[in-house]
Amino acid sequence: MAGPGRRTATAGRPAAGVAPDLPAVWALLSAAEPSVALHGGTGRADSAEGLNGALAQARYALASARTTSPDASALIDAASLTGLGTLLTGIPAEVRTAFSRTVLGPLFEAGNPSFAALLETLEIFLACDGSWSRTAEALHLHVNTVHYRVQRVEHFTGRDLSSLYDRLDLRAALLCRPRRPARP
């Protein structure tokens, strides 16, 4: 019911001015008690039928906000989760860690003292779109050394880096690794 100073909404449209006001309201809420980290997530519904989906998106965005800014206030719109890295932030930390350990774990469990070099090679190789020469250049190594390291990664993980699906699994596992807190 609309009254003086009240805004009304029709199905599929937010009340006039609600969306543009949200950043300003969020800034006020965050500033009211800066020592308390506030987290919020938003999702968009284009119709009444889309409300359940919008709620699910908002919950996922909220989980992402909590993950990416555990000690600071953050408001994330589900529409901003447009890449694999940002999409993965909405997955619970325990699930991300378990996935990473499952996929990359053999590198660590093998007792391989060169696991750090293998992980670095894997990260650079994937960042260079599987280019042997660009990876070698970025790591200041000979191409044969890159080939050897990639073969070792494939051996320990059971993944084939010439397969797109295996590359995606390994990239996701790297992104899911637990992050160490920054040193002061």
Regions found by a protein language model. Name each.
Residues 1-184:
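Cytosolic nucleotide-utilizing catalytic cores of signal-transduction proteins
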